[in-house]
Amino acid sequence: MSVKYIATSKLPTPWGVFAMHGFEETATGKEHVALTFGQLDPTEPMLGRIHSECLTGDALFSLRCDCGFQLQAAMQSIAEQGQGFLLYLRQEGRGIGLLNKIRAYELQDAGANTVEANERLGFEADMRKYDMILPMLTQIGVTKVKLMTNNPRKVMAMQNMGIEVAERIPLQVGKNRYNESYLKTKSTELGHMMSEYHFHDE
């Protein structure tokens, strides 16, 4: 995939000042962002996360998923580490888009789980692609990662591109009564690696 680097600016956040790097897919015009913190070292594994856009969770504070909680936890961990990165990929609704995601939520309100809802709309359970990762990481100077994720597909995608995943760090935050069924489906049907933390009351 051809991805064009556009520009870099400062991004002040509650956890510190990140650098925000803009990218554009040349074939589609789709825009993605890389956040970096501190001085990245291409010879060492960098703490990082690959985060797919979730307007409802990231910006509207939805409790239906754990996305917003994961985004904030990842940014805080990177800042506390003193260096790291976060790739923010514009793949709303596991790749089906915002309006289709709302349609899927409507089906979930009627009893479907997150996978069933996507499939009833004619989509695969997870439509996301990760081809844009390699040129983005190359631009910011990352070749080895300590990846914050519960999703084995992200680990496999990076390894298939020749990026060394030195460690997978679980990111288990944000469980609540509205998303417990969703989290169980991600574990049982999408293969996400989660501990019993998600499935028992604290």
From Swiss-Prot:
UniProt catalytic activity: GTP + 4 H2O = 2,5-diamino-6-hydroxy-4-(5-phosphoribosylamino)-pyrimidine + formate + 2 phosphate + 3 H(+)
One CC-aspect GO term: cytosol
The entry's keywords: GTP-binding, Hydrolase, Metal-binding, Nucleotide-binding, Riboflavin biosynthesis, Zinc
Organism: Shewanella frigidimarina (strain NCIMB 400)
Enzyme class: hydrolase
Signal peptide interval: none
Name of the protein in its database record: GTP cyclohydrolase-2
Record flagged with keyword Zinc: yes
